[in-house]
């Protein structure tokens, strides 16, 4: 019943009945006059009633509002246009705009029902949004048509003049510029792009005036103050302009005005003078002017391709300065691996400090440092290693390589072996220095050479039991694994340690078995090392030597013992790798001499005739040693550098072991003794093994040839691996992938790659594509 009465009475309340009460409140709100709480609520109620009861009410309210808003704006227009001066006009406009813009948020609120009725919205479904309000749009559109569109160019010009004045150091009320921007941002009637008018006018004018300003100012500043002061100027202006842009330009997320302004400033202040600024880079790097370089870096990083020339300058400097320092110290570092590694580390730390302080460890500059340092490490100018290659019976030489991996291995040996260097260092210091070696090793191209030498040194340390710290020795194996050394190589090193531990158990069992037996030598004095041929990679060459009877008699006992525990395995004796301690007695005193098996065999020749002179020819017959090994062994006994009185004497005198003749006579020095602090010692111990290699000359040649042969096999394997996966591949792509696979071992030379491709084609593993000779196809 109530609903039907309402419908029957619909139309009884008209717009005209309420507008006279509503209008004074609307005018008060427009003029920013105070309104009571009751008037505010009455306005809400009256708008709601008119929209509900008068069918034409919403349209009439909209029209009436439009007229009153227009009238109010005309009054504001008159106040603004009364000023002829542009600055005064701008100030007056901003005063009026501020008041009006505030009311644009307040006046629409009581007219929510009008929004719902005109737009067909359901108030219960969607909250009214003031920014989308019809009343607000009406207010802003009317302001735009009546005032802003007519004077916007004058306002904009005035605003740009104020910004220009601020750049010259003058102060003003920043709200004058901000108000103009707000007008542009809020007075756009395009619903698709509300920032269109702002972008096309205010932003464009701001960017254009900025560019004009610096196109004039920058060149003259550069000419008057020079590049280095100009960089400070440009940096300061870029920061200043960014702060200014954040004040005066629109910063909402969908607008990129600040970014556009900064790009404009970079073009005017930096890009235009890119070549002039970059011309200073090389000199700054040489003079280590890190602060200036950092400033240049921050400027050039804003310019497309601005960093590339700096990277090139850094690379060139590191290579030239690094090699110059190495050449200057060549006399020392070529003979002293410790000094060599220290020199390399000094260079690395110096260049790393430069990159950190000047370029904040930017990845691009770190890459440039690494590339250049790698060139220094692998340079073969100062000292080189030539690896021989036997091919079809002809001795060839590969392209010379840096001796760096060999010297790094030598330095590791000095740290890991019992040496004066390792003795004065703590375990922590040794570990730190080994980690430094591994750092340099990362830059070595031909790591396989390091592996060969490192393994040779490790073999010597384990066999002679001269490791400074067994725990660090084993840690080193894991560190090599961590830095990416090939697994098969690292596994062999680990197996070597395993063999030593197994040998210790075997020795214990052997001694236990023979503790009550009478052997040629007491079991306690014997230390047997049973080594796996695969892990230790010993040469197939066996050097024969006539052993003393005591050793000859011991060998069958060891073999019998081993066969009982390991049936089916055969022992191959490597006397070359053996060593022992013998006692030397004379009238002066008694001395223990640590000797190789070859030295022992030579010295035992005098056991039955201690005072006789024996010729080189007879010693050869007695020991049955090869000529080269006998010469080397004798020289170690007649010219041992640490002894003031040598073990053997000889005549006539010669300059090198090569000068020994069949008739050279050798005799035991009956006055041999150890001298300490200029005093003759009656007892003592001396190691005569020294740096004698536990390999023959031929074995060393084999090892160097082995490096090359292994490279050939690795290259062939890698090519087959790639071809199996790709089936068909271009020459360029094959070479790229090949280097990627082999880079942790060595860098294959183009000549070697070409030769192995031809070998694989010849043996029908791959073939050339008939339509393109630079494409290869895998043959299953």
UniProtKB/Swiss-Prot annotation:
Any one GO MF annotation of this record: ubiquitin ligase complex scaffold activity
Keywords noted in UniProt: Host-virus interaction, Isopeptide bond, Nucleus, Phosphoprotein, Receptor, Ubl conjugation, Ubl conjugation pathway
Phenotypic consequence of residue 53 to A: Strongly impaired interaction with HIV-1 Vif protein. Decreased interaction ith SOCS2
Predominant location: nucleus
Modification comment: Neddylated; which enhances the ubiquitination activity of ECS complexes and prevents binding of the inhibitor CAND1. Deneddylated via its interaction with the COP9 signalosome (CSN).
InterPro entries noted in UniProt: Cullin, Cullin_CS, Cullin_homology, Cullin_homology_sf, Cullin_N, Cullin_neddylation_domain, Cullin_repeat-like_dom_sf, WH-like_DNA-bd_sf
Cross-link (Glycyl lysine isopeptide (Lys-Gly) (interchain with G-Cter in NEDD8)): 724
Domain Cullin neddylation: 711-772
An annotated GO BP: SCF-dependent proteasomal ubiquitin-dependent protein catabolic process
Subunit structure and binding partners: Component of multiple cullin-5-RING E3 ubiquitin-protein ligase complexes (ECS complexes, also named CRL5 complexes) formed of CUL5, Elongin BC (ELOB and ELOC), RNF7/RBX2 and a variable SOCS box domain-containing protein as substrate-specific recognition component. CUL5-containing ECS complexes specifically contain RNF7/RBX2, and not RBX1, as catalytic subunit. Component of the ECS(ASB2) complex with the substrate recognition component ASB2. Component of the ECS(ASB6) complex with the substrate recognition component ASB6. (Microbial infection) Interacts (via the substrate recognition component) with HIV-1 Vif; forming an active cullin-5-RING E3 ubiquitin-protein ligase complex (ECS complex).
Name of the protein: Cullin-5
Annotated organism of origin: Homo sapiens
């Amino acid at each position: 019943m109530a609903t039907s009465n309402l419908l029957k009475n619909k139309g009884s309340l008209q717009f005209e009945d309420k507008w006279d009460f509503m209008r004074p409140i609307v005018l008060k709100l427009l003029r920013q006059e105070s309104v009571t709480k009751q008037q505010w609520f009455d306005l809400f109620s009256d708008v709601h009633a008119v929209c509900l009861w008068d069918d034409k009410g919403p349209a009439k309210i909209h029209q009436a509002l439009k007229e009153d808003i227009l009238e109010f704006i005309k009054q504001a227009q008159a106040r603004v246009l009364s000023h002829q001066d542009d600055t005064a006009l701008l100030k007056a406009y901003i005063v009026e705009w501020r008041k009006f813009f505030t009311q644009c948020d307040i006046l629409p609120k009581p007219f929510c029902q009008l929004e719902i009725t005109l737009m067909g919205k359901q108030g219960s479904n969607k909250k009214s949004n003031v920014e989308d309000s019809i009343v607000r749009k009406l207010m802003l559109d009317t302001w735009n048509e009546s005032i802003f569109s007519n004077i916007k160019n004058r306002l904009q010009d005035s605003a740009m003049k104020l910004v220009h004045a601020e750049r010259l150091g003058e102060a003003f009320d920043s709200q004058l510029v901000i108000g103009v921007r707000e007008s542009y941002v809020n007075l756009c009637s395009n619903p698709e792009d509300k920032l269109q008018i702002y972008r096309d006018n205010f932003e464009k004018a701001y960017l254009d005036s900025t560019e004009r300003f610096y196109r004039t100012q920058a060149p003259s500043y550069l000419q008057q103050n020079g590049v280095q002061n100009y960089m400070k100027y440009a940096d300061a202006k870029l920061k200043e302009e960014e702060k200014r842009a954040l004040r005066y330009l629109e910063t909402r997320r969908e607008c990129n005005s600040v970014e556009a302004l900064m790009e404009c400033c970079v073009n005017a202040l930096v890009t235009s003078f890119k070549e002039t600024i970059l011309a200073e880079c090389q000199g700054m790097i040489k003079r280590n002017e890190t602060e200036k370089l950092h400033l240049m870096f921050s400027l050039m990083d804003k310019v497309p391709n601005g960093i590339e020339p700096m990277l090139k300058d850094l690379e060139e400097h590191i290579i030239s300065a690094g090699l110059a320092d190495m050449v200057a110290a060549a006399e020392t570092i070529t003979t002293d691996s410790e000094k060599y590694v220290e020199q390399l580390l000094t260079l690395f730390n110096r260049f790393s400090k430069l990159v950190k302080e000047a370029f904040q460890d930017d990845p691009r500059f770190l890459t440039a440092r690494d590339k250049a340092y790698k060139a220094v490490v692998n340079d073969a100018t100062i000292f080189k290693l030539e690896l021989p290659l036997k091919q079809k019976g002809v001795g060839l030489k590969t392209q010379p390589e840096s001796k760096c991996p060999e010297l790094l291995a030598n330095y590791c040996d000095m740290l890991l072996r019992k040496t004066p260097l390792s003795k004065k260092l703590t375990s922590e210091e040794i570990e730190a220095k080994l980690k430094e070696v591994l750092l340099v090793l990362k830059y070595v191209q031909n790591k396989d050479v390091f592996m060969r030498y490192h393994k040779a040194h490790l073999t010597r340390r384990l066999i002679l039991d001269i490791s400074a710290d067994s725990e660090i020795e084993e840690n080193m194996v894991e560190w090599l694994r961590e830095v990416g050394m090939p697994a098969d190589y690292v596994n062999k090193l680990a197996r070597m340690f395993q063999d030593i531990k197994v040998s210790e158990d075997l020795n214990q069992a052997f001694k236990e078995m023979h503790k009550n037996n009478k052997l040629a030598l007491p079991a306690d004095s014997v230390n047997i090392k049973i080594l796996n041929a695969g892990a230790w990679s010993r040469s197939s060459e066996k050097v024969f030597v006539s052993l003393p009877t005591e050793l000859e008699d011991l060998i069958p006992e060891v073999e019998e013992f081993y066969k009982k525990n390991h049936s089916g395995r055969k022992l191959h004796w490597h006397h070359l790798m053996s060593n022992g301690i013998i006692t030397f007695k004379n009238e002066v005193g008694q001395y223990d001499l640590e000797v190789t098996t070859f030295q022992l065999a030579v010295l035992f020749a005098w056991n039955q005739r201690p005072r006789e002179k024996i010729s080189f020819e007879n010693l050869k017959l007695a020991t049955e040693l090869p000529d080269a090994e006998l010469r080397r062994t004798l020289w170690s006994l007649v010219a041992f550098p640490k002894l003031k009185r040598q073990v053997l004497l000889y005549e006539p005198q010669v300059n090198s072991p090569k000068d020994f003749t069949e008739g050279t006579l050798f005799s035991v020095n009956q006055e041999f003794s150890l001298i300490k602090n200029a005093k003759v010692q009656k007892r003592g111990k001396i190691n005569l093994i020294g740096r004698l290699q536990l390999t023959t000359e031929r074995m060393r040649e084999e090892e160097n040839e082995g490096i090359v042969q292994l490279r050939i096999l690795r290259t062939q394997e890698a090519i087959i691996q790639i071809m199996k996966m790709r089936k068909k591949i271009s020459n360029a792509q094959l070479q790229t992938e090949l280097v990627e696979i082999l880079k942790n071992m060595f860098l294959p030379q183009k000549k070697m790659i070409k030769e192995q491709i031809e070998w694989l084609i010849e043996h029908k593993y791959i073939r050339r594509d008939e339509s393109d000779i630079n494409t290869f196809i895998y043959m299953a």
